[in-house]
């Protein structure tokens, strides 16, 4: 790669150059981690070393996936450099997102289902007619909640990291017609503001005597806008179910990349990136639809048993598996009605944070815990 002279930040020992690309990408990763930790502690009120351990895993898988994806899409930076030498570029963020998503699903499914990471809430159950008994209800935290927590933070990391492409003078757009060695003519167009507000960007986008569209700047701008909307605003929108925020990230980054990829210079154009962007959009739309309309019904036991019962009916229609056992079908139908009736309604808090699809395990309070509960009840009602 023919890098500009100002792409090197400094040299170590006089012979090992440290590139601005690596520094800026590192800053983007650190800033994304800070946003993750902030929401983890102050918004979700979760503090556990296992969450911080995932940060270490995510950084490694993000870099590894991005590096491998450069090979998949045919990036010349991958072929011309050592695998671990990505100071000169060769990181495709889409691959990092894919690999980290897979690892995250595996990690959090194991981690959140462990006994030490179940949440307990005090509930009141009516025993007999008039006796109220306090109990602990133990639930699993949904993986979708973790998706809401982590995914939006990646956007701000991408927004910052895109500036590394500027210092490497890569991932720019095609040349604007009629700009050959004529900065004054371009200064009177819509890109003239760069000459005043960002003179370094203005100078850096003149490549081979022609002005190139600063795609890094455009993508960084829209990534920042979507980050603010998804990270700060969507949590306050009534009716947004868990998982919707996380899948909104896939939809947003897919749309941004799909539009901007078509304006890239042919040197940096990869058809695989177009396909991956479409995949992200499809995953985002299907994920949002599932979280908003399907998953919330599956959490309602009525709909869970309804789908199970419907499945058995369809299976019985096409096969003879259940046709000769009418008694079994009758028992299933009775269980379907019996289990669905007392569980039709759930609180918004449960629907938002505890996507449990199985019956919660109930623990009776000890006498000491019961006394504490009575004291708390007396304080809150006085």
From Swiss-Prot:
One of its GO terms (molecular function) is phosphatidylglycerol-prolipoprotein diacylglyceryl transferase activity. A 1,2-diacyl-sn-glycero-3-phospho-(1'-sn-glycerol) binds at residue 162. Its EC number is 2.5.1.145. Keywords: Cell membrane, Membrane, Transferase, Transmembrane, Transmembrane helix. The keyword Membrane applies. It is a multi-pass membrane protein. Pathway: Protein modification; lipoprotein biosynthesis (diacylglyceryl transfer). GO terms for biological process: lipoprotein biosynthetic process. It is found in: Cell membrane. The keyword Transferase applies. The chain crosses the membrane at residues 18-38, 53-73, 91-111, 213-233, 243-263, 274-294, 302-322. GO terms for cellular component: plasma membrane. Belongs to the Lgt family. NCBIfam families: lgt. Catalyzes the transfer of the diacylglyceryl group from phosphatidylglycerol to the sulfhydryl group of the N-terminal cysteine of a prolipoprotein, the first step in the formation of mature lipoproteins. This is Phosphatidylglycerol--prolipoprotein diacylglyceryl transferase. It comes from Mycoplasma genitalium (strain ATCC 33530 / DSM 19775 / NCTC 10195 / G37) (Mycoplasmoides genitalium). The lineage of its organism: Bacteria, Bacillati, Mycoplasmatota, Mycoplasmoidales, Mycoplasmoidaceae.
């Amino acid at each position: 790669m023919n890098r500009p002279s100002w792409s090197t930040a400094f040299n170590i020992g006089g012979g090992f150059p440290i590139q601005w690309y690596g520094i800026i990408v590192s800053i983007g990763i650190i800033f994304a981690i800070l946003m993750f930790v902030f929401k983890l502690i102050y918004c979700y009120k979760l503090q556990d070393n296992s969450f911080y351990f995932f940060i270490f895993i995510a950084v490694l898988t993000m870099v590894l996936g991005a590096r491998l994806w450069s090979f998949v899409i045919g990036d010349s930076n991958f072929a011309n450099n050592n695998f671990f030498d990505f100071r000169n570029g060769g990181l495709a963020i889409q691959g990092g997102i894919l690999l980290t998503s897979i690892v995250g699903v595996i990690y959090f499914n194991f981690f959140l289902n462990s006994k030490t990471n179940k949440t307990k809430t005090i509930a009141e159950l009516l025993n007999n007619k008039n006796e109220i008994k306090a109990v602990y209800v133990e639930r699993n935290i949904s993986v979708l909640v973790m998706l809401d927590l982590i995914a939006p933070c990646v956007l701000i990391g991408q927004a910052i990291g895109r500036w590394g492409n500027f210092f490497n003078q890569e991932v720019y757009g095609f040349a604007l017609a009629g700009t050959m060695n004529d900065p004054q003519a371009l200064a009177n167009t819509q890109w003239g503001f760069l000459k005043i507000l960002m003179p370094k960007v203005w100078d850096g986008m003149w490549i081979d005597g022609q002005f190139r569209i600063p795609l890094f700047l455009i993508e960084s701008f829209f990534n920042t806008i979507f980050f603010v909307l998804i990270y700060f605003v969507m949590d306050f929108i009534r009716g947004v179910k868990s998982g919707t925020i996380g899948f909104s990230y896939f939809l947003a980054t897919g749309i941004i990349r799909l539009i901007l990829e078509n304006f890239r210079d042919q040197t940096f154009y990869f058809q695989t990136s177009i396909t991956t962007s479409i995949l992200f959009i499809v995953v985002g739309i299907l994920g949002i639809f599932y979280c908003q309309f399907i998953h919330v019904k599956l959490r309602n036991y009525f709909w869970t048993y309804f789908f199970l019962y419907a499945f058995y009916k369809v299976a019985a229609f096409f096969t003879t598996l259940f046709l000769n056992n009418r008694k079994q079908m009758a028992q299933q139908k009775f269980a379907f009605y019996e289990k669905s009736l007392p569980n039709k309604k759930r609180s918004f808090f449960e629907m938002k944070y505890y996507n449990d699809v199985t019956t919660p395990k109930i623990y009776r309070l000890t006498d000491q815990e019961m006394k504490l509960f009575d004291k708390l009840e007396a304080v809150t009602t006085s």
